[in-house]
């Protein structure tokens, strides 16, 4: 029998869910209008008042919010509660090197844990499980999100954080982990490392919870077949609540969105009209109960489709498909958002023999993302001794690692060797077959 953490909500009829969403939308719109000058101004520009929003069907009258709006109002411009009521902030890298900050009230943190716990329940986990978390802990939402979820579930969490694969394997084996959570690329690397060490039969694993970067069904099947487990796709974004916005169940027929807290729309990116079920468009979220930084119609730039039919598991929550891409050129590398503009800014800041002509190449090696940046440098550089070339390469790699938050391989090339484009420059070659 499929375990459902909150059947009242997760199996609610569409009419009941719409009534709950309507009640929450009316409340959140009034709150942002009264407390967030940014939203008040945006709504006034559209000639919309809180009284015009009577139900969830009126959501199309409201303005969009974008990542740029978050950046322009950094750090606390979109706060809807007094700063003293903020329990914590989480963050993610932005295009300008400034973080995208997401403040949380204590209730927001509790809701976050509850949503992740619903997902862990979809993965068949209970308070008897031991969940090994190898997502990074810190401003990045991965580690803490899974930790809060394990706590809400009553399970034991092992807060390993990222890196040191041998130690990860030792802890998983010695502590008897029954589930592990990390990016899919690291999950595959870890699975193969466990296999090579002959430890598959020593493990008690039954589930993997993986997200923070796009991955294919082929990759899922590979991890599952090596470790003899079920792997689940978890989705979230720091601005909305980190992991736990949506997750798939054992039927793996789309990710269930916790639509009582996060109202999903899938819209045609050009016309902003709603897409029919099954039609691909941009995913847009409205947070229905967030206290600290509610977001209205936040454009995620993730491309997906939506399905409102009831799942075989009995849940009526809408399901979104695996992501087919993004509407912009951002790349997710080892769970970190990397923008070509960040590379450009970093190279320009160095000046000297370095030209702002570059190419980012993303590969998968041993199932881990590897970012190589080709950088054009002055011809004179190549007449220098090898030691000087290595020093320059290391210097650029250091600057890029600081700017991007991921380590980078740097390849120095001669001027004009990177192809120029007439139109929009091709800055990224992604060989990962995602």
Where are these regions (language model features)?
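AMP-binding/adenylate-forming catalytic core of the ANL superfamily
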Residues: 180, 289-404, 423
């Amino acid at each position: 029998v499929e375990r459902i953490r909150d059947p009242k909500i997760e199996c609610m009829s569409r009419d009941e869910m719409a009534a709950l969403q309507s009640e929450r939308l009316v409340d959140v719109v009034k709150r942002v209008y009264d407390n967030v000058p940014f939203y008040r101004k945006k709504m006034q520009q559209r000639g919309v008042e809180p009284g015009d929003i009577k139900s969830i069907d009126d959501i199309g009258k409201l303005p969009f919010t974008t990542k740029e709006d978050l950046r322009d109002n950094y750090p606390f411009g979109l706060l809807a509660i007094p700063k003293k009521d903020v329990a914590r902030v989480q963050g993610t890298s932005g295009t300008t090197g400034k973080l995208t900050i997401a403040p949380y009230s204590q209730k927001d943190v509790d809701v976050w844990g509850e949503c992740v716990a619903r997902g862990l329940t979809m993965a068949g986990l209970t308070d008897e499980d031991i969940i090994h978390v190898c997502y990074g802990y810190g401003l990045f939402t991965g580690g803490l999100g899974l930790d809060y979820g394990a706590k809400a579930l009553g399970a034991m969490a092992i807060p390993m954080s990222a890196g040191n694969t041998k130690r990860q394997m030792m802890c998983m084996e010695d502590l008897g982990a029954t589930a592990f959570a990390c990016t899919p690329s690291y999950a595959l690397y870890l699975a193969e490392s466990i296999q090579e060490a002959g430890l598959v039969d020593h493990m008690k694993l039954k589930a993997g919870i993986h997200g923070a970067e796009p991955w294919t069904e082929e990759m899922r099947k590979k991890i599952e077949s090596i470790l003899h487990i079920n792997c689940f796709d978890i989705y979230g974004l720091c601005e909305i609540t980190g992991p736990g916005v949506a997750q798939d169940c054992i039927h793996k027929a789309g990710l269930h969105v916790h639509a009582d807290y996060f109202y999903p729309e899938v819209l045609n990116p050009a016309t902003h009209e709603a897409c029919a079920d099954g039609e691909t468009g941009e995913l847009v979220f409205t947070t229905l109960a967030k206290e600290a930084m509610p977001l209205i119609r936040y454009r995620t730039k993730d491309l997906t489709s939506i399905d409102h039919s009831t799942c075989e598991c009995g849940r009526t929550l809408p399901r979104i498909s695996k992501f087919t891409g993004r509407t912009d050129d951002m790349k997710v590398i080892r769970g970190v958002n990397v923008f070509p503009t960040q590379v450009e800014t970093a190279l320009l800041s160095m000046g000297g023999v370095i030209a702002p002509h570059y190419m980012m190449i993303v590969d998968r090696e041993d199932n881990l993302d590897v970012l190589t940046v080709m950088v054009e440098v002055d011809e004179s550089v190549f007449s220098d001794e090898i030691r000087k070339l290595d020093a320059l390469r290391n210097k650029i790699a250091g600057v890029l690692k600081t700017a991007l938050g991921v380590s980078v391989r740097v390849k120095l090339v001669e001027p004009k060797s990177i192809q120029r484009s007439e139109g929009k420059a091709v800055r990224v070659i992604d060989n990962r077959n995602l």
